[in-house]
Amino acid sequence: MSQAAVKIDRYITFEGIECDEQARRVLDCIRDCIEAPEASSWSAYFERKLDEITRMGQDELFVVGSQVNYIRALFEHHGHREGLDLLDRIEDECC
């Protein structure tokens, strides 16, 4: 059976899930949004958060998991479909 045909279940194993990579990609999507010409009320908030992550060496997956609702609001505001899809995947597979 191919890897694609197997439903990934985080309660069995994290093998093949790549949660850290997914979290890094979500942070890239956040950067896309805050660099967009159309600013949102979330821009300054996430600029500070991204600075904190770097300064404090925080775990990216932890940050994404603890900010899910705020990240979702940012992505919805910007219509960032890729970011929303990644966020849903992280919630399902990693959190």
UniProtKB/Swiss-Prot annotation:
Keywords: Nitrogen fixation. InterPro entries: CowN. Pfam families: CowN. One of its GO terms (biological process) is nitrogen fixation. Transmembrane segments: none annotated. Is required to sustain N(2)-dependent growth in the presence of low levels of carbon monoxide (CO). Probably acts by protecting the N(2) fixation ability of the nitrogenase complex, which is inactivated in the presence of CO. Belongs to the CowN family. HAMAP family: CowN. This is N(2)-fixation sustaining protein CowN. It comes from Allochromatium vinosum (strain ATCC 17899 / DSM 180 / NBRC 103801 / NCIMB 10441 / D). The lineage of its organism: Bacteria, Pseudomonadati, Pseudomonadota, Gammaproteobacteria, Chromatiales.
